[in-house]
């Protein structure tokens, strides 16, 4: 059977080696005669798994010792609520930078919980014709006392990525659901990083939270216990039963990342994949990208057929040759190739080959 390359924005493809290992030990994990899905989350075997997973994640991201790592329920949207409830209190204010669909969704959730007056927003995307470009003002010139600044450095729907480290006078909260461990970052510049697992970490149902200890002293709003960071830290992410199979797969992905040379080597591979695809799009008059070069996402490459009447045929023919989930988000249309860490270069090369052939056959 020929290879199928899954370009879904999430849940996304997992590394082949991880999938094969999970398959091989699905019914008998660690010599226990049972699946990892069937054992107690408080068993010594599973505790050992979770401890090693945290060690590996800390090593991969160079997480300082004054940061806690939580493995939580809820995905990214769950963290939209958790951030507000854990940090804002009754009288605090927060600033949200808006650069696309997911940062907008975070704003909506924050305003629902805290009210309009506690949440300020700043749109940082400018339009130059059809091209989107990020423009971030000098944040230190804003005369406000915010509990935190929230932003999403990679917008999957819009294909926009912010590569610069923000210079913020307030603690930075970053939604890295779609670009965590895709490139090296300085964790110490952030107050909190959260990420839904289903793009670069594992299957859906799990979220990772990396939080600086001092932020846990901020006033809280009433909230559910399972989304309380303080309780999560106190109970080692096991105040309630965690999503154990997702945690297990995340642990295997961390091992795979280490065996691949770590985040630095994965970053080089990601840049090569994205560069291959963007270079082709820019050189072909049949397709176009609508994001400024300096803000083009390495993880989510959006592109448009100049004759959009061919969209359905493009998707149909791509699927027939093993290139699936290329349809763009319904809110923006076009196409989207999500090329997260697990996507091999061969998948991108096959996509470019198909796009070349499709363009040659369908030019007017």
Swiss-Prot record:
Alphabetized InterPro entries for the sequence: Aminotrans_V_dom (IPR000192), Aminotrans_V_PyrdxlP_BS (IPR020578), Pser_aminoTfrase (IPR022278), PyrdxlP-dep_Trfase (IPR015424), PyrdxlP-dep_Trfase_major (IPR015421), PyrdxlP-dep_Trfase_small (IPR015422)
GO cellular component annotations of the record: cytoplasm
Main location: cytoplasm
Gene this protein is translated from: serC
Cofactor note text: Binds 1 pyridoxal phosphate per subunit.
Record EC number: 2.6.1.52
PANTHER family per the UniProt record, alphabetical: PHOSPHOSERINE AMINOTRANSFERASE (PTHR43247:SF1)
One of the GO BP terms on file: L-serine biosynthetic process
Single GO term (MF): O-phospho-L-serine:2-oxoglutarate aminotransferase activity
Keywords (A to Z) from UniProt: Amino-acid biosynthesis, Aminotransferase, Cytoplasm, Pyridoxal phosphate, Pyridoxine biosynthesis, Serine biosynthesis, Transferase
Organism: Shewanella woodyi (strain ATCC 51908 / MS32)
Designated name of the protein: Phosphoserine aminotransferase
Binding-site residues for L-glutamate, renumbered to this chain: 42
Keyword tRNA-binding annotated: no
Residues annotated to bind pyridoxal 5'-phosphate: 76-77, 102, 156, 175, 198, 240-241
Function: Catalyzes the reversible conversion of 3-phosphohydroxypyruvate to phosphoserine and of 3-hydroxy-2-oxo-4-phosphonooxybutanoate to phosphohydroxythreonine.
Subunit structure: Homodimer.
């Amino acid at each position: 059977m020929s290879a199928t390359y899954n370009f879904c924005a999430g849940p996304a493809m997992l590394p082949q080696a991880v999938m094969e290992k999970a398959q091989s030990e699905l019914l008998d994990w660690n010599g226990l005669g049972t699946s990892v899905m069937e054992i107690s989350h408080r068993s010594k075997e599973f505790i050992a798994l979770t401890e090693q997973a945290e060690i590996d994640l800390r090593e991969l991201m160079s997480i300082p010792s004054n940061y806690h790592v939580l493995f939580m329920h809820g995905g990214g949207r769950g963290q939209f609520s958790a951030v507000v409830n854990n940090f804002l209190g009754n009288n605090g204010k927060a600033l949200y930078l808006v650069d696309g669909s997911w940062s907008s969704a975070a704003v909506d959730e924050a305003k629902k919980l805290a009210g309009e007056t506690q949440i300020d927003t700043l749109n940082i995307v400018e339009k130059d014709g059809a091209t989107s470009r990020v423009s971030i003002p000098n944040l230190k010139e804003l005369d406000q006392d915010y509990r935190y600044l929230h932003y999403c450095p990679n917008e999957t729907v819009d294909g926009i990525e912010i590569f610069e480290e923000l210079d913020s006078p307030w603690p930075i909260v970053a939604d890295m659901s779609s670009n965590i461990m895709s490139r090296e970052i300085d964790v110490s510049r952030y107050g909190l990083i959260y990420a839904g697992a289903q793009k670069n970490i594992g299957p859906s149902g799990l979220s990772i939270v990396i939080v600086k200890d001092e932020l846990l002293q901020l006033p809280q709003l009433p909230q559910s216990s399972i989304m309380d960071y303080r309780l999560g830290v106190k109970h080692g992410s096991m105040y309630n039963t965690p999503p154990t199979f997702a945690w297990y797969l995340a642990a295997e992905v961390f091992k795979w990342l280490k065996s691949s040379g770590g985040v630095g080597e994965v970053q080089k591979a990601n840049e090569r994949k994205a560069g291959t695809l963007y270079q082709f799009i820019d050189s072909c008059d049949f397709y176009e990208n609508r994001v400024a070069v300096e803000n083009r996402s390495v993880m989510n490459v959006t592109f448009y057929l100049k004759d959009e009447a061919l969209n359905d045929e493009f998707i149909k023919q791509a699927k027939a040759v093993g290139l699936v989930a290329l349809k763009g988000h319904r809110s923006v249309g076009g196409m989207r190739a999500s090329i997260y860490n697990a996507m091999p270069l061969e998948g991108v090369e096959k996509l470019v080959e198909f796009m070349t052939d499709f363009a040659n056959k369908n030019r007017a």
